[in-house]
Protein backbone atom coordinates (compact mmCIF):
# COMPACT_ATOMS: atom_id res chain seq x y z
CA UNK A 1 0.00 0.00 0.00
CA UNK A 2 1.69 3.16 -1.26
CA UNK A 3 0.13 6.36 0.06
CA UNK A 4 0.71 10.07 -0.52
CA UNK A 5 -0.53 12.55 2.09
CA UNK A 6 -1.78 15.91 0.83
CA UNK A 7 -3.02 18.92 2.78
CA UNK A 8 -2.17 22.49 3.61
CA UNK A 9 0.44 23.33 6.27
CA UNK A 10 -1.24 22.87 9.63
CA UNK A 11 -3.90 20.48 8.30
CA UNK A 12 -2.44 17.64 10.38
CA UNK A 13 -1.28 15.40 7.54
CA UNK A 14 2.05 14.66 9.25
CA UNK A 15 0.28 13.41 12.38
CA UNK A 16 -2.05 11.25 10.29
CA UNK A 17 0.90 9.90 8.25
CA UNK A 18 2.59 8.75 11.48
CA UNK A 19 -0.62 7.08 12.70
CA UNK A 20 -1.07 5.26 9.36
CA UNK A 21 2.56 4.10 9.43
CA UNK A 22 2.12 2.77 12.95
CA UNK A 23 -1.16 0.96 12.29
CA UNK A 24 -0.06 -0.71 9.04
CA UNK A 25 3.59 -1.18 10.03
CA UNK A 26 4.90 0.70 7.00
CA UNK A 27 7.50 3.52 6.98
CA UNK A 28 6.51 7.18 7.25
CA UNK A 29 8.80 8.88 4.76
CA UNK A 30 9.37 12.63 4.58
CA UNK A 31 11.71 14.30 2.10
CA UNK A 32 13.28 16.26 4.97
CA UNK A 33 14.29 13.01 6.68
CA UNK A 34 15.64 11.62 3.40
CA UNK A 35 17.76 14.73 2.77
CA UNK A 36 19.14 14.66 6.32
CA UNK A 37 19.96 10.93 6.16
CA UNK A 38 21.72 11.19 2.78
CA UNK A 39 23.73 14.24 3.84
CA UNK A 40 24.65 12.69 7.21
CA UNK A 41 25.77 9.45 5.52
CA UNK A 42 27.72 11.38 2.88
CA UNK A 43 26.04 9.61 -0.05
CA UNK A 44 26.70 10.85 -3.58
CA UNK A 45 23.07 11.99 -3.89
CA UNK A 46 23.25 13.65 -0.47
CA UNK A 47 26.37 15.61 -1.38
CA UNK A 48 24.76 16.75 -4.64
CA UNK A 49 21.66 17.88 -2.74
CA UNK A 50 23.82 19.68 -0.14
CA UNK A 51 25.61 21.64 -2.86
CA UNK A 52 22.26 23.13 -3.96
CA UNK A 53 21.04 23.69 -0.39
CA UNK A 54 24.28 25.44 0.62
CA UNK A 55 23.71 27.94 -2.20
CA UNK A 56 20.13 28.49 -1.05
CA UNK A 57 18.81 26.82 -4.21
CA UNK A 58 16.01 24.28 -4.54
CA UNK A 59 17.13 20.67 -4.95
CA UNK A 60 16.16 19.55 -8.50
CA UNK A 61 13.16 17.22 -8.69
CA UNK A 62 15.15 14.42 -10.40
CA UNK A 63 17.63 14.41 -7.51
CA UNK A 64 14.88 14.35 -4.87
CA UNK A 65 13.10 11.52 -6.70
CA UNK A 66 16.38 9.57 -6.99
CA UNK A 67 16.86 9.78 -3.21
CA UNK A 68 13.21 8.88 -2.68
CA UNK A 69 13.46 5.83 -4.96
CA UNK A 70 16.55 4.69 -3.12
CA UNK A 71 14.61 4.96 0.17
CA UNK A 72 11.47 3.16 -1.04
CA UNK A 73 13.66 0.39 -2.46
CA UNK A 74 14.74 -0.56 1.07
CA UNK A 75 13.40 -3.86 2.53
CA UNK A 76 11.16 -2.10 5.07
CA UNK A 77 9.13 -0.61 2.19
CA UNK A 78 8.19 -3.95 0.60
CA UNK A 79 4.62 -3.73 1.97
CA UNK A 80 4.26 -0.03 1.19
CA UNK A 81 4.95 3.39 2.70
CA UNK A 82 3.42 6.79 3.47
CA UNK A 83 4.92 9.80 1.68
CA UNK A 84 4.65 13.08 3.57
CA UNK A 85 5.78 16.36 1.98
CA UNK A 86 6.33 15.02 -1.53
CA UNK A 87 5.25 15.59 -4.23
CA UNK A 88 4.45 19.29 -3.79
CA UNK A 89 4.11 20.24 -7.47
CA UNK A 90 2.82 18.71 -10.72
CA UNK A 91 6.36 18.29 -12.19
CA UNK A 92 7.38 16.40 -9.02
CA UNK A 93 4.28 14.18 -9.23
CA UNK A 94 4.98 13.42 -12.90
CA UNK A 95 8.64 12.66 -12.17
CA UNK A 96 7.62 10.33 -9.33
CA UNK A 97 5.06 8.56 -11.55
CA UNK A 98 7.64 8.02 -14.30
CA UNK A 99 10.20 6.66 -11.87
CA UNK A 100 7.73 4.29 -10.17
CA UNK A 101 6.31 3.03 -13.47
CA UNK A 102 9.87 2.09 -14.46
CA UNK A 103 9.71 -0.36 -11.54
CA UNK A 104 6.15 -1.48 -12.38
CA UNK A 105 4.93 0.30 -9.25
CA UNK A 106 2.36 3.03 -8.63
CA UNK A 107 0.81 5.11 -5.86
CA UNK A 108 -2.38 3.48 -4.53
CA UNK A 109 -3.95 6.37 -2.62
CA UNK A 110 -3.52 10.14 -2.44
CA UNK A 111 -5.26 11.29 0.75
CA UNK A 112 -6.16 14.96 1.06
CA UNK A 113 -6.67 16.16 4.64
CA UNK A 114 -9.03 19.04 3.91
CA UNK A 115 -9.15 22.03 6.27
CA UNK A 116 -10.28 25.57 5.39
CA UNK A 117 -7.75 28.42 5.43
CA UNK A 118 -9.76 30.11 8.20
CA UNK A 119 -9.50 27.01 10.38
CA UNK A 120 -5.77 26.61 9.72
CA UNK A 121 -5.03 30.24 10.64
CA UNK A 122 -7.04 29.77 13.86
CA UNK A 123 -5.23 26.50 14.62
CA UNK A 124 -1.71 27.75 14.00
CA UNK A 125 -2.01 31.24 15.46
CA UNK A 126 -3.29 29.63 18.67
CA UNK A 127 -0.03 27.75 19.16
CA UNK A 128 2.42 28.83 21.85
CA UNK A 129 5.92 27.51 22.47
CA UNK A 130 8.40 27.58 25.33
CA UNK A 131 11.77 28.63 23.94
CA UNK A 132 13.54 27.23 27.00
CA UNK A 133 12.30 23.61 27.17
CA UNK A 134 10.52 23.24 23.80
CA UNK A 135 7.08 22.42 25.25
CA UNK A 136 4.17 23.38 22.98
CA UNK A 137 0.63 24.45 23.83
CA UNK A 138 -2.52 25.64 22.11
CA UNK A 139 -4.53 28.44 23.67
CA UNK A 140 -7.80 26.68 22.81
CA UNK A 141 -7.03 22.94 22.82
CA UNK A 142 -4.03 22.48 25.16
CA UNK A 143 -3.78 25.68 27.22
CA UNK A 144 -1.14 26.10 29.95
CA UNK A 145 -2.39 26.15 33.55
CA UNK A 146 -1.31 29.78 33.86
CA UNK A 147 -1.75 31.95 30.77
CA UNK A 148 1.52 32.71 28.98
CA UNK A 149 3.62 30.54 31.32
CA UNK A 150 5.07 27.08 30.60
CA UNK A 151 3.75 24.34 32.92
CA UNK A 152 7.04 22.44 32.71
CA UNK A 153 9.66 25.09 33.46
CA UNK A 154 7.83 28.33 34.28
CA UNK A 155 9.30 30.25 31.33
CA UNK A 156 7.36 32.66 29.12
CA UNK A 157 5.42 31.18 26.19
CA UNK A 158 5.75 32.85 22.79
CA UNK A 159 3.97 32.88 19.44
CA UNK A 160 6.60 31.74 16.94
CA UNK A 161 7.03 33.78 13.75
CA UNK A 162 6.02 30.72 11.71
CA UNK A 163 2.67 30.62 13.50
CA UNK A 164 1.77 34.31 13.10
CA UNK A 165 -1.38 34.81 11.00
CA UNK A 166 0.36 36.79 8.22
CA UNK A 167 3.08 34.11 7.87
CA UNK A 168 0.49 31.32 7.83
CA UNK A 169 -1.52 33.12 5.12
CA UNK A 170 1.61 33.46 2.95
CA UNK A 171 2.37 29.74 3.34
CA UNK A 172 -1.22 28.90 2.46
CA UNK A 173 -0.99 31.02 -0.70
CA UNK A 174 2.14 29.10 -1.78
CA UNK A 175 0.28 25.84 -1.05
CA UNK A 176 -2.74 26.86 -3.14
CA UNK A 177 -0.54 28.01 -6.04
CA UNK A 178 1.77 24.98 -6.10
CA UNK A 179 0.15 22.02 -4.40
CA UNK A 180 -3.57 22.50 -4.98
CA UNK A 181 -3.21 21.42 -8.66
CA UNK A 182 -2.12 17.99 -7.31
CA UNK A 183 -5.70 17.51 -6.11
CA UNK A 184 -6.84 17.64 -9.76
CA UNK A 185 -3.88 15.50 -10.89
CA UNK A 186 -4.71 12.63 -8.52
CA UNK A 187 -8.47 13.04 -9.06
CA UNK A 188 -7.90 12.37 -12.78
CA UNK A 189 -5.94 9.25 -11.85
CA UNK A 190 -8.88 8.09 -9.73
CA UNK A 191 -6.86 7.66 -6.53
CA UNK A 192 -7.67 10.87 -4.63
CA UNK A 193 -9.59 10.46 -1.37
CA UNK A 194 -10.60 13.50 0.69
CA UNK A 195 -11.18 13.48 4.45
CA UNK A 196 -12.56 16.26 6.62
CA UNK A 197 -9.54 17.43 8.62
CA UNK A 198 -11.58 19.68 10.92
CA UNK A 199 -12.77 16.66 12.91
CA UNK A 200 -11.07 15.35 16.03
CA UNK A 201 -7.70 13.73 15.21
CA UNK A 202 -9.04 10.23 16.01
CA UNK A 203 -12.09 10.75 13.77
CA UNK A 204 -9.88 11.90 10.89
CA UNK A 205 -7.81 8.75 11.34
CA UNK A 206 -10.92 6.53 11.47
CA UNK A 207 -12.09 8.06 8.16
CA UNK A 208 -8.68 7.33 6.59
CA UNK A 209 -8.68 3.72 7.84
CA UNK A 210 -12.13 3.26 6.27
CA UNK A 211 -10.70 4.39 2.92
CA UNK A 212 -7.72 2.04 3.16
CA UNK A 213 -9.71 -1.09 4.08
Predicted segments, located by residue:
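Glycine-rich phosphate-binding loop of ATP-dependent small-molecule kinases
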Residues: 1-213
